[in-house]
């Protein structure tokens, strides 16, 4: 009897372990995960403010994505590269006009910067929002006019 319980328990543990392989268990359908966050690539063209509102409406606690470490950056690069190759993508970083510093929309600290060479340049003095650039395989940032339309990345 003891051996049967031990083997049954082992099979149960194995089944639960395998059920999580390749699945985003804690994310809704259409979203992918990295660590404890969920992400969704949105194929609509929106201004930065429109994209932020869309993310908030799409999912409770949704925001344009913050990117807080290199591992997260690499995961996002891999996901974007599967889908798009020549499209820049809004993320949740913008220049605070009040404080003149870059801030994540979700309030998390800017712990790293991944600017493309020569960026941010505030071209024509109206680039206050940030995209992941396709030419960098979505690893680097560029400041852009917030009123331009781009596809975007939501996170919760």
Curated annotation (Swiss-Prot):
Glycans are attached at residues 35, 109. Ca(2+) binds at residues 127, 142-143. Disulfide bonds join 27-38, 55-154, 129-146. Residues 34-155 form the C-type lectin domain. Belongs to the true venom lectin family. This is C-type lectin lectoxin-Phi2. It comes from the Eukaryota. Residues 1-23 form the signal peptide. PANTHER family: MANNOSE, PHOSPHOLIPASE, LECTIN RECEPTOR RELATED. Keywords: Calcium, Disulfide bond, Glycoprotein, Lectin, Metal-binding, Secreted, Signal. Mannose-binding lectin which recognizes specific carbohydrate structures and agglutinates a variety of animal cells by binding to cell-surface glycoproteins and glycolipids. May be a calcium-dependent lectin. Expressed by the venom gland. A motif (Mannose-binding) lies at residues 119-121. GO terms for cellular component: extracellular region. One of its GO terms (molecular function) is metal ion binding. SUPFAM superfamilies: C-type lectin-like. It comes from Philodryas olfersii. It is found in: Secreted. InterPro entries: C-type_lectin-like, C-type_lectin-like/link_sf, C-type_lectin/snaclec_domain, C-type_lectin_CS, CTDL_fold. The keyword Glycoprotein applies.
């Amino acid at each position: 009897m003891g051996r049967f319980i031990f083997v049954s328990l082992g099979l149960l543990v194995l089944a639960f372990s395998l059920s999580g392989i390749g699945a985003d268990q804690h994310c809704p359908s259409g979203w992918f995960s990295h660590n404890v966050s969920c992400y969704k690539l949105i194929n609509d063209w929106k201004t930065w403010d429109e994209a932020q509102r869309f993310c908030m409406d799409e999912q409770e606690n949704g925001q344009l994505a913050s990117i807080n470490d290199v591992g997260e950056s690499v995961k996002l690069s891999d996901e974007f590269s599967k889908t798009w190759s020549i499209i820049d993508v809004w993320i949740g970083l913008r220049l605070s006009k009040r404080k003149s510093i870059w801030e994540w929309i979700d309030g998390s600290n800017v712990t790293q910067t991944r600017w493309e060479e020569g960026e941010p340049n505030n071209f024509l003095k109206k680039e206050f929002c940030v995209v992941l650039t396709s030419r960098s395989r979505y690893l680097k940032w560029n400041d852009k006019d917030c009123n331009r339309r781009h596809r975007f990345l939501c996170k919760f």
